[in-house]
Amino acid sequence: MDRLEAMAMLVEAVDSGSLSAVSRKMNVPLPTVSRKIADLESHLGTRLLIRSTRKLVLTDAGAAYVSVAKRILEQVAEAERTAAGEYSAPRGDLSVTAPIVFGRLHVLPVVTDFLARYPEINIRLMLSDRNVHLIEEHVDMAIRLGTLPDSSITATRLGEVRHVVCASPSFLAAHGVPETPNSLVMLPCISHDFLAAPRPAWPFRKPGTKVEIVAPVRVRLAVTTAEAAVDAAIAGVGVARLISYQVAEAVARGALQIILAQYEPEPMPVSMLHAGQGILPLKVRSFLDFAAPRLRAAMAAERLNPGREAR
């Protein structure tokens, strides 16, 4: 029995969710796929998969085996790439994901410079505000905001961003500057989260402490993107809660003013992630080494000019 082949079939079955998908992808008859996985289970003396008409479910032994098998297959692939000379020069396709506005403002300029430097690398840049699963969606690198619970992901810290509350000068002149988060319930607010609770509220922090406080807000306008929320706030529709980089340009030119800064929650870390451990493919290592210092510099420059708080 070719254990590496059977191992690869098992991992692909777990990733794709069916033996039929393995058969199509690996161009192997379905009975062969089923037999090889059964032979692997027989060799190991334990059940790895529970098969049903709808889905495949890993047993506890199967989950432990697949976790190790993925690392083994990655190491074999790395060894083959090294022997084939891939590591002599960066080349190939690279998939990168980032939040929409952060990606447009900061990642895209880095990507364009990187492509000019490395003509044999192609990049697929996915801009999305959802947390893309690196392994399941075959993504090489991700820019992620917030804490990182998954220990199988390797992170490089880039900096941090803030959740800020802001409004236009004309809106504040007409309605007054709120002095506490609880004042927001009296003002029209802008939300760009359609999944908000029926009684929306924004989190804040008690000044000088780490104690979180939650203030109810009255949402007058709900939109689907941060850009639309920024535009609506500039137009004077209401108060918006956004991430600092999303409003940095508008604040810097005076179109928006930050309020309640002393109540802001703890800043969120920004990290660059890649899956797996050990030796990185040269295309991934090259992008990490190229992008990380440039993104750190861009975020530092943005922090130096945050605009002034309304008073």
Residue ranges and their predicted role:
Residues S152-H163, A167-H192:
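Flexible hinge/capping segments at coil-to-helix
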Residues E12-N27:
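Short helix-boundary/capping micro-motifs
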Residues V214-I258, P265, H274, L288:
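Hydrophobic hinge/microswitch elements
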Residues P188-K210:
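Secondary-structure junction motif
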Residues E41-L58, L256:
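A short LG(V/I)-centered, amphipathic sequence patch enriched
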